[in-house]
Amino acid sequence: MPNLSSVPDEAHTEPRPAESATPKRRKSRKVSNPTSPPIPAEAADTLPDWPEFIRNSSPGDVERRFAKEAAAILASEPVVANNYACVALLQPERSIGQFELDQIFAALAKSNPDSAKDVLLLLLSPGGGIEPAYQISKVCKTSAKDKFVVCIPRQAKSAATLIALGADEIHMSLLGHLGPIDPQVQGLPALGVSQALETLAVLVERHPGSANMFATYLQNSVRIEQIGYYERICESAVQYAERLLSSKSALPKPAAEIARELVHEYKDHGFVIDLAEAMEHLGDTWIKVATPEVMAAERLYRLFERVNLFLGFYKSKVLWIAGSVSEGIFIFDRPKTRGA
């Protein structure tokens, strides 16, 4: 599957929970502290700060407390609480795939079955697969009453940018940013093949005596069908982006031009398309800043980062959200880094 992610290959696999290879919610009775009771609602004000709580609690207890505090953050902002069915993809180290698509679909089917509310997607992701990202965007739009809103507190790169292109509004914090949507194949840019061939052609033209050497190298390194495949998946990314953009009004440029720029213009897959550049590409009527949605997302992001900091330090685990902010919380063993 063509991938738009810049995360390491190890993070492209399905998540590995601390006790099972199958992604599923942790249950406190299966962890090392089976006697930990559920957190009483009336004890919320007496709970210790997160570092101490994480050090002494089971993953199930951490999930429950995080879910309660996250729900309180969203409920405290009337614009968010009253107008939106909220879902989230907060996964800074994992690629978007079928699992994420299924989680978003299930959460919206449960929380907004009759499309009575608009949809707000809180998005933090390095990217992932083209196809599931496109489908997530379409599912969110179809499930919304009137509008689908994406809120980006930090990075929404690559395939996450593709998701955002299908939104009616993109709300960004000052540190929020998008990224190019050029596909990656085994961690390398698909566009790099044709660009490498062009570079070799220029070198041969300058140094005709090197032609046989380069011809032998290419014969042993690249198959003709690979070149065609890489070209086609790049054009596929353009098509997906153009389809999501085509329904938008008041774009500063034609949808096809914007889509092509996002695939072909940038030389580095990790390039930061910040707030100002996003407005230049997409228009300042589409990009929103300093909104109640952004304020709620910032508060949730700070909670998310704080919990993950101490989960990693004390437990070597990571918390992700995929789908419902209250029920789509998962704690896994932290993925090993390269060379570890």
Say what each PLM segment does:
Residues M1-V149, H171, Q184-A340:
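N-terminal organellar transit peptides
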Residues Q91-P92, A167, L175, I181:
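Fold-independent oxyanion-binding glycine-rich loops
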Residues S125-E131, R154-S158, H177-L178:
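Acidic, metal-coordinating catalytic cores used for nucleic-acid/nucleotide bond scission
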Residues I152-A156, L165-G166, H171, G179:
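Hydrophobic/aromatic-rich structural module bridging two neighboring secondary-structure elements via a short loop
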Residues A159-A160, D274:
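Conserved sugar-transfer catalytic core signal across GT-A, GT-B, and GT-C glycosyltransferases
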Residues A160-E169, L174, L282-G283:
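Active-site-proximal glycine-rich helix-loop-beta segment
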